[in-house]
Amino acid sequence: MENQKNFLTTAPYKGTRDFYPEDMRLRNWMFSVMRETVLSFGYEEYDGPILESFDLYKAKSGEEIVERQLYDFIDKGERRVAIRPEMTPTLARMVAGNLRNLPKPVRWFSIPNLWRYEQPGKGRLREHWQLNVDLFGVDSHRAELEILLIADSILKKFGAPIGSYQIKVSHRKLLDSFLKNSLKLNGDQVHGVSKLLDKKSKISPEAFETEMKPFLNNFKEQFSLIETYLNSNLETVSKIPGIDTNSVSFIQNLFQELGELGIDKQLLFDPSIIRGFDYYTGCIFEVFDTNPENRRSLYGGGRYDNLIGLFSKEQLSGIGFGLGDVTLKNFLEGHNLIPNLSREKTIFLPIMDESLFVDTFKLSKELRENEILTETMLDSAKIGKQIQIAEKKGYRYVLFLGESEIRTETVQIKDLISGEQKSLPRKGLSDTLKKDFQL
């Protein structure tokens, strides 16, 4: 019996994806829509290293990320480093390092590659890309207004109809006042209760109640007040004793102006919005998919006024959000918003005969110089086989350049979808393809 060789697996690392050309077409389209939308608001793109000091995340990221999700190791220089799980700490470091030279307000965005060691599931992978949009240097609610407009505009740019998503808004000071003033909790209790509130939607009501008991002194009364808070609206929440009414007024004013700008139908006050990151200090929000098969948070963000405090004595207000590519793709698929991304906009040019290789390549060069995407075969296989390749690759239009076409200064174009084929004059060919075939 012959020895069997143990081949390496062709599967990617758990929680990651291979991006074949068809996958890259989708990813590039998603990124281009996001990028174009944010650029239209005057934002500038930035990037940073995928490796950072472990201390940066220890200081700025949430407890769950640092203790359970961080990919970290000791490098060859005996430094403890980590692969970035989020972009905000890097952003804070970069802004603080060049603070005096940056004109305010600072409007930046990025689409970085991020890593977290967590159990893969729907909408969650260990490696993903995330649009990060951040605005620094504006203290007023107009910063929240602009960020929420961008968050809304992105989904509209993808063609999302009204009702397909909902923007839920709350305020961190509202929650803090409820926990400290209304429930009269101490520091450890505040920490425990807020963590439970953040994961409430992921556990059963029974588990939520059971896990809440150790943090409450007068369970029945305090738990009843928690339920009242979670079920309140902008009118009723302000009636809870000890609540921060300034936060309520802030959200009311914000909603009024956003309504005047046409996005009131998507807005909802929801005090259960917590946002797990420890650095949020003000208004917070999450965008939710309303599809019954994918009722989950798509993305979110909020204000973080103390973000650069570890790097500088200067204060700089900031607000931003992050939108991951995995949850966005699920949303687009669930609402049938992904367009036809096949190679219909690219010409396929077979070689009719070996003697016509140079003429064929001259034609492809001419088309590309006129900004028409063109793939040219590199050998003169049987024409039927070349057509099969074009069909398999998803092309729609094939150009034929044979000896008779060269003599008559024409080309033949065939639509592989309809089967129609006709002759086109070689003169002005690029203009004809753009005008009549939308290439």
UniProtKB/Swiss-Prot annotation:
Localization annotation: Cytoplasm
Main location: cytoplasm
ATP-binding as UniProt keyword: yes
InterPro entries noted in UniProt: aa-tRNA-synth_II, aa-tRNA-synth_II/BPL/LPL, Anticodon-bd, Anticodon-bd_dom_sf, His-tRNA-ligase, HisRS-like_core, HisRS/HisZ, HisRS_anticodon
Pfam families: HGTP_anticodon (PF03129), tRNA-synt_His (PF13393)
UniProt record, GO biological process: histidyl-tRNA aminoacylation
Domain of life: Bacteria
Residue ranges the record marks as coiled coil: none
Its EC number(s): 6.1.1.21
Name of the molecule in the record: Histidine--tRNA ligase
Source taxonomy: Bacteria, Pseudomonadati, Spirochaetota, Spirochaetia, Leptospirales
